[in-house]
Regions:
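C-terminal substrate-binding subdomain of Rossmann-fold SDR/epimerase-dehydratase oxidoreductases
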Residues: 1-146
Length: 146
């Protein structure tokens, strides 16, 4: 098993949102949003990165019955300079204007996400292969140059 790098102490907080909830929000904005308006989409699921990593480890350990999948895989690495400690999202506007809110609790969404990845190993193999990396680098290498 590969080590899992975690920046600094892993206490950077992010707002987590299940993919289907995000897609529904995009759909609602496309169908009913006002042109030129900005709608923040958030899940009201703020968690520290280290919590996410440990949750994934626990879920994979339980599903795969592999004692090699444990917190021992976590490797704390030097934090990025200026790394934000928290990304807070206020989705009040999209809720008030369009009636959108996240339907999937974090605990259910993370399990559904892990299950999807486990059921689609061929997709994972493809995107982690050298060929995909070469394609990605070729497609985006000059995009920042304007």
């Amino acid at each position: 098993h590969k080590q899992l790098p975690v920046y600094g102490d892993g206490m950077q907080i992010r707002d987590w949102l299940y993919v289907e909830d995000h897609c529904k929000a995009i759909d609602m904005v496309a169908d009913g949003g006002k042109i030129g308006e900005v709608y923040n989409v958030g899940g009201h699921n703020e968690r520290p990165n280290i919590f996410i990593v440990k949750t994934i480890i626990e879920q994979l350990h339980d599903r795969l019955h592999d004692d090699g999948i444990s917190d021992a895989l976590i490797k704390h690495v030097e934090d990025r300079l200026g790394h934000d400690r928290r990304y807070g999202i206020d989705p009040t506007k999209i809720k008030n204007d369009l009636g959108w809110y996240p339907e999937t609790p974090f605990e259910k969404g993370i399990v559904l996400t892990i299950d999807w990845y486990l059921a689609h190993e061929e997709w994972m193999d493809h995107v982690t292969s050298g060929n995909y990396q070469k394609y990605y680098e070729e497609m985006y290498k000059n995009k920042a140059e304007v």
